Amino acid sequence: MRLQLIAIGTKMPDWVQTGFSDYLKRFPKDLPFDLTEIAAGKRGKNADIARILDKEGEQMLAAVAKGNRIVTLDIPGARWETPRLAQQLERWKQDGRDVSFLIGGPEGLAPACKAGAEQSWSLSPLTLPHPLVRVLVAESLYRAWSITTNHPYHRE
């Protein structure tokens, strides 16, 4: 199984790059984790946000390999505590399909992305900045992996 993070935005602050890269390199070779960045649509004063979201959504879905499980990151999604996420990760491994996690831009995800998802995951009831979500997802998935392998990273 491979994990893929598909996120809107290509120019992230250094702290995002550093934090995400730190967790990315920790993943074992048998659980590769890749990042696919989608350029954000230009948002000006009179921008058609619905059209921008639709275009971003098309690009995100085009980046998902056929057969992948799609999991959106969205406030109304399921709130998984860490042990539950570890169980979820094990189920995904047993399913054998790759998993693509979708993180929207400033206005969230396109309706087509939400409609195409098999699952939706909420990190918090708070609205989080989309760059921060990248780091939180990477850390959460790494922690879940550490639980499934009895790695000492996670402590109760």
From Swiss-Prot:
Keyword tags: Cytoplasm, Methyltransferase, rRNA processing, S-adenosyl-L-methionine, Transferase
State which Enzyme Commission number(s) the record gives.
2.1.1.177
Residues that hold S-adenosyl-L-methionine according to the record: 73, 104, 123-128
Record-level GO cellular component terms: cytoplasm
Principal location: cytoplasm
Q: Which HAMAP family match?
A: 23SrRNA_methyltr_H
An annotated Gene Ontology molecular function: rRNA (pseudouridine-N3-)-methyltransferase activity
Tell me the CDD domains matching this sequence: RlmH-like
Q: List the subcellular locations.
A: Cytoplasm
The question of whether Methyltransferase is a record keyword is answered with: yes
Q: Which gene encodes it?
A: rlmH
Q: Which reaction does it catalyse?
A: pseudouridine(1915) in 23S rRNA + S-adenosyl-L-methionine = N(3)-methylpseudouridine(1915) in 23S rRNA + S-adenosyl-L-homocysteine + H(+)
Coiled-coil boundaries: none
InterPro entries in the record? Alpha/beta_knot_MTases, RlmH-like, tRNA_m1G_MTases_N
This protein is called what?
Ribosomal RNA large subunit methyltransferase H
- Top-level taxon: Bacteria
The family classification in the record reads: Belongs to the RNA methyltransferase RlmH family.
- What role does this protein play? Specifically methylates the pseudouridine at position 1915 (m3Psi1915) in 23S rRNA.
Record flagged with keyword rRNA-binding? no
